């Protein structure tokens, strides 16, 4: 068991990669065997993630050096800097790993029925596993270049999955937009990395943080990295791709795309807090991120009001919810150099942002799965063409209502638990920001109430009289999200104490992250 945990960082990435190449071979022999192997494999990965999380929370940062005589040996004998590929897993990394593991497993369970009638399922599961491996790599890697590599893996596989249903023109358009935006963001990341590498001859994040001199080129690199990852997570004004992509991808893939966007949010946090940290005055950077967050909240919710396509409505709500996370992150960055303010409300704002990341994945994921279930049964996403579905799709209707209430931040659901942390902390920083957040949540509730009544209430339309509930595996996938939403809403204190606070502490502790690399010399 000890050896398994020691090697778990690389296994968590390697197992999905291996399964991605084995899936087509197994699928040619038996579809059932292929499905079973994928589910068992991702269940094993989830087990490794939770085991690693326990180890990190109890024992601190876990480093894994590929090719070293010992996985914990980060700096080879005879050198003063890390030169190998290093995976560095701390509280915030493993937190994101938990999010990815849960969502990936749910996505596969949902796909068993939702993608059953599609051709090319071997390719579908291969691409899905590649995207999962890339997402894990983004949050576990300890160097910037491999962050770029894993970002590329998620981008290419994600674009192919968005456009997977090639018979639909809008799917192809969505996939094309996703790959174009991803390519631009990736090139920006690569250019920023080249600016840093040219100065310091280093790629490891911890080593770079220790050597950082905050030159003009360093500041330019920071601006480029913020813009690139804000684009990937769908922050305004770089959100133009998100609704066109999320609304046309298979529902299970949209859920995974949310985690990829959150991996970009993680990268933004890692760069701001660890790579640059307190030495650089982050007040201006924090306010820029707050501004992006407020714009995302406002534009996201106002665009959602206008939508009649249920998936586009949820997609714009994703833009809005990303705004809440960005505001919490921005407040934390703004007071990073002020120990008193950081302790009073800064860490609470960061905790709210981090907690909202997993909550966002859960309730938005549930809403997209519900939208996928509706499309699976009636073949349309147009709310004006729906009505009375709650009579024949009772579970689906209940799941939509649950996700909508959670997204609106109402108790006793998980969205309330994370938003209240953001509201309370941000109020101490600037009350106006909290008022804006509350107003946005009220409008969000109104949007979802309207959508719920349009789709599920009223008399059953004649053309939908024979509509039945979706298959059991799709119900099971939605149930997993629903149960976690309720648990997180009823026991938020436990979740904050067990995983959110360790993630927050790791994010603001630049010295420990650096020492985990630079202190492990032979």
Predicted regions and their residues:
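Transmembrane helix-loop-helix hairpins at membrane boundaries of multipass inner-membrane proteins
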Residues: 1-11, 21-126, 501-510, 518
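Structural signature of hydrophobic alpha-helical transmembrane segments
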Residues: 4-15, 91-102, 144-157, 216-231, ...
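Alpha-helical multi-pass transmembrane bundles of energy-transducing inner-membrane proteins
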Residues: 29, 123-130, 134-220, 231, ...
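Alpha-helical transmembrane segments and their helix-start/interface "positive-inside/aromatic belt" motifs
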Residues: 31-42, 173-183, 311, 315, ...
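Membrane-interface alpha-helices at helix entry/exit sites of multi-pass transporters
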Residues: 34-36, 174-177, 249-259, 381-397, ...
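Juxtamembrane/interfacial segments at transmembrane-helix boundaries in multi-pass membrane proteins
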Residues: 56-84, 187-244, 267-288, 325, ...
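Hydrophobic alpha-helical transmembrane segments of multi-pass membrane proteins
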Residues: 96-99, 180, 223-230, 256-257, ...
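Predominantly late transmembrane helices and immediately cytosolic-facing juxtamembrane segments
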Residues: 236, 364-368, 432-467
């Amino acid at each position: 068991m000890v050896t398994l945990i020691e090697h778990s960082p690389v296994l968590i990435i390697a197992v999905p990669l291996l399964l991605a190449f084995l899936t087509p071979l197994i699928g040619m022999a038996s579809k059932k065997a292929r499905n079973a192997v994928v589910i068992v494999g991702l269940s094993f990965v989830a087990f490794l993630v939770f085991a690693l999380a326990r180890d990190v929370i109890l024992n601190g940062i876990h480093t894994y050096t590929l090719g070293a005589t010992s996985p914990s040996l980060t700096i080879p004998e005879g050198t003063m800097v890390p030169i190998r590929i290093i995976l560095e897993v701390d509280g915030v990394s493993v937190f994101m790993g938990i999010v990815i593991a849960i969502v990936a497993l749910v996505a596969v369970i949902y796909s068993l029925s939702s993608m059953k009638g599609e051709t090319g399922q071997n390719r579908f599961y291969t691409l899905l596993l590649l995207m999962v491996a890339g997402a894990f790599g983004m949050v576990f890697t300890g160097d910037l270049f491999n962050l770029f590599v894993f970002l590329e893996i998620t981008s290419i596989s994600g674009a192919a999955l968005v456009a997977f249903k090639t018979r639909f023109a809008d799917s192809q358009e969505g996939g094309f937009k996703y790959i174009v935006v991803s390519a631009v963001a990736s090139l920006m990341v690569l250019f920023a990395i080249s600016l840093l590498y040219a100065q310091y001859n280093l790629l490891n994040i911890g080593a770079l943080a220790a050597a950082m001199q905050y030159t003009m080129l360093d500041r330019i690199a920071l601006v480029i990295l913020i813009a690139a990852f804000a684009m990937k997570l769908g922050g305004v004004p770089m959100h133009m791709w998100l609704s066109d992509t999320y609304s046309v991808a298979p529902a299970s893939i949209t859920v995974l795309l949310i985690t990829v966007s959150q991996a970009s949010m993680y990268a933004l946090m890692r760069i701001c807090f660890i790579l640059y940290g307190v030495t650089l005055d982050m007040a201006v950077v924090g306010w820029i991120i707050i501004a992006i967050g407020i714009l995302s909240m406002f534009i996201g919710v106002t665009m959602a009001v206008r939508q009649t396509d249920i998936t586009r409505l949820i997609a714009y709500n994703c833009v809005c919810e990303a705004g809440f996370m960005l505001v919490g992150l921005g407040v934390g960055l703004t007071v990073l150099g002020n120990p008193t303010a950081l302790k009073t409300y800064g860490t609470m704002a960061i905790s709210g942002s981090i907690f909202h990341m997993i909550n966002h994945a859960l309730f938005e994921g549930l809403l997209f799965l519900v939208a996928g279930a509706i499309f699976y049964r009636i073949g349309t996403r147009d709310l004006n063409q729906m009505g009375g579905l709650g009579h024949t799709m009772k579970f689906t209707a209940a799941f939509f209502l649950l996700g909508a209430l959670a997204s609106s931040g109402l108790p006793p659901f998980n969205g309330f638990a994370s938003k209240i942390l953001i509201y309370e902390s941000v109020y101490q920083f600037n009350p106006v920001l909290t008022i804006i957040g509350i107003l946005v949540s009220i409008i969000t509730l109104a949007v979802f109430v309207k959508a719920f009544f349009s789709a599920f209430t009223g008399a059953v339309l004649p053309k939908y009289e024979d509509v039945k509930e979706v298959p059991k595996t799709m119900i099971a996938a939605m149930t997993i999200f629903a149960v976690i939403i309720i648990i997180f809403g009823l026991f938020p204190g436990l979740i904050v104490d067990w995983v959110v606070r360790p993630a927050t502490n790791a994010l603001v502790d630049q010295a420990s992250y650096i020492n985990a690399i630079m202190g492990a010399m032979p």
